[in-house]
Amino acid sequence: MASVDQSQLCSKSVSMSLSVDDGVQRRTGDYHSNLWDDDFIQSLSTPYGAPCYRERAERLIGEVKEMFNSVRLSPLNDLLQGLSMVDSVERLGIDRHFKNEIKSALDYVYSYWSEKGIGCGRESVVTDLNSSALGFRALRLHGYPVSSDVFKDQNGQFACSANTQTEGEMRGVLNLFRASLVAFPGEKVMEDAERFSAIYLKEALKTVPICSGSLSGEIEYVLEYGWLTNFPRLEARNYIDIFGKDTSPCLQTEKLLELAKLEFNIFHSLQQRELKQVSRWWKDSGFSQLTFTRHRHVEFYTLASCIAIEPKHSAFRLGFAKLCYLGIVLDDIYDTFGTMDELELFTAAIKRWDPSATECLPEYMKGVYMVFYECVNQMAREAEKTQGRDTLSYARNTWEAVFDAFLEEAKWISSGYIPTFEEYLENGKVSFGYRAATLQPILTLDVPLPLHILQEIDFPSRFNDLAASILRLRGDVCGYKAERSRGEEASSISCYMKDNPGATEEDALNQIDTMIKEKIKELNWEFLKPDSNVPISSKKHAFDILRAFYHLYKYRDGFSIANNETKSLVMRTLLETVPF
């Protein structure tokens, strides 16, 4: 297991003087306090770091590989069996052990793929909805060129023969729904498939008593989380529960489930060690004294460990958690707490990038600046180990753009200015910080990102532009009322209404929702397009960061209100083990 010198990773403690008694009237966001006491976090323990659990997992990995190899023995259902194996190991979060087996299985399926899809086996003479839908989704997610025309009839219209509600048919429609969520722009048949399958599945849950516990749980989960609010460790945690509800498990299911539970709990022991470091960094750096900001260091580490679930990616998880936490502190300084004079000084200090730049800053900003400075520098050193080049200037340019966007929004707040929708979004997709949150962490991964590949992921690529726009728009939908109550008038909603006199808030929200849906399809294309110069594996973590952030906006602004669904996410994926 690769390790990082944790004593060096953004860990320098800076004593902050945070008493602000200068007579200046300051706004605050009135956020709830930190939910995770450092003493509680330091007391966490688990037995799953013991070697015996790793040894048992390794034996099971070998047995599952043998299961992959035996799939092709039956010509009547080998395609469906292979796809089901791929689907299961991916959803259980154990696919990293079977990359060669997954590629071999998908190459085999693709060799039998036709314009009408596939049957259950290589000798099947009739195509099968479940096999075709599962195959379409898996092949598209792995970059194979497959057309959605497989779901059309001879007249070019969406066609589905599902008219009963047997368990087999429901599973086929479920996988059709899952396939429809990875639609590309212009695929109307996939829109029709999504509409049909969603209605069918919701009705099935209400009316069909024969639906097994595992299938009903699977349907409920997919309808709830879909594609963009789902991400690896969250899906693994929930799918383990669903898998465990199978009333007639076979030996294959039992082995997969045992391995998934072991891997989940073994990784949990690593999560605990890293979480303790993040919490101690937060406490020792003096952030616990900040009363005006959102303390979400534990939540950001949770997201990081739900995205990067390979043990060797420790630098990604720790760096992402700390950079995102610092980003949210600085966002609160610019949006509410800081005065315009202070913000101008801080922005200038960032561009100087020198500890001596703190001399002109107010006391409460000095410590924040120094911790931020050390963290960005150390992340650049970590990136140099994997990329073989100095990326600090790249990171600095990224953050300078964010602070310029922060400052522009602060000016709007101060003056009450509401820009045009285009002006707002152009600035807002930078100020959201997606690019800054993504760039340095992905550079620490063991995936080479030469400049020509990085340019396809980072700004100003279409991929980055779409991801940042989606997050800014979704964030506004969830948070514009709270921001307006704090005197922050500019949002995509208010800007749309300004551009379109007579438009209501409902009109604006409907239009923005439509924009988000279209941008998601475009992003699917940028992420999954076949024959790209950039492998999907190089874009995956950047895409999963988008999904993690988008997840926090599923019900409300989960960055600001973290004591509901966000707290549940922390408990289920970070603090609790899976029972055997």
From Swiss-Prot:
Q: What class of enzyme is it?
A: lyase
Q: Which residues bind Mg(2+) 1?
A: D331, D335
Q: Which SUPFAM superfamilies match?
A: Terpenoid cyclases/Protein prenyltransferases, Terpenoid synthases
The residues the record assigns to binding Mg(2+) 2 are D331, D335
Q: Name one GO molecular function term.
A: lyase activity
Query: In this entry, which stretches build a coiled coil?
Result: none
Which amino acid positions bind Mg(2+) 3, per UniProt?
Answer: E483
Q: In which pathway does it act?
A: Terpene metabolism; oleoresin biosynthesis; Sesquiterpene biosynthesis
Motif DDXXD motif: positions: 331-335
Is Metal-binding tagged as a keyword?
Answer: yes
Entry EC no(s):
4.2.3.46, 4.2.3.106
Q: What does the record give as the reaction this protein catalyses?
A: (2E,6E)-farnesyl diphosphate = (3E,6E)-alpha-farnesene + diphosphate; (2E)-geranyl diphosphate = (E)-beta-ocimene + diphosphate
Alphabetic keyword roster: Lyase, Magnesium, Metal-binding
The UniProt entry, under InterPro entries, shows: Isoprenoid_synthase_dom_sf (IPR008949), Terpene_cyclase-like_1_C (IPR034741), Terpene_cyclase_plant_C1 (IPR044814), Terpene_synth_N (IPR001906), Terpene_synth_N_sf (IPR036965), Terpene_synthase-like (IPR050148), Terpene_synthase_metal-bd (IPR005630), Terpenoid_cyclase/PrenylTrfase (IPR008930)
Q: Which cofactor names does the annotation list? A: Mg(2+); Mn(2+)
- Function (record text): Terpene synthase (TPS) involved in the biosynthesis of sesquiterpene and monoterpene natural products included in conifer oleoresin secretions and volatile emissions; these compounds contribute to biotic and abiotic stress defense against herbivores and pathogens. Catalyzes the conversion of (2E,6E)-farnesyl diphosphate (FPP) to (3E,6E)-alpha-farnesene and of (2E)-geranyl diphosphate (GPP) to (E)-beta-ocimene.
User: How does the entry describe the domains?
Assistant: The Asp-Asp-Xaa-Xaa-Asp/Glu (DDXXD/E) motif is important for the catalytic activity, presumably through binding to Mg(2+).
- Family recorded in the similarity comment: Belongs to the terpene synthase family. Tpsd subfamily.
Q: What is this protein called?
A: (E,E)-alpha-farnesene synthase
Q: What is the lineage of its organism?
A: Eukaryota, Viridiplantae, Streptophyta, Embryophyta, Tracheophyta
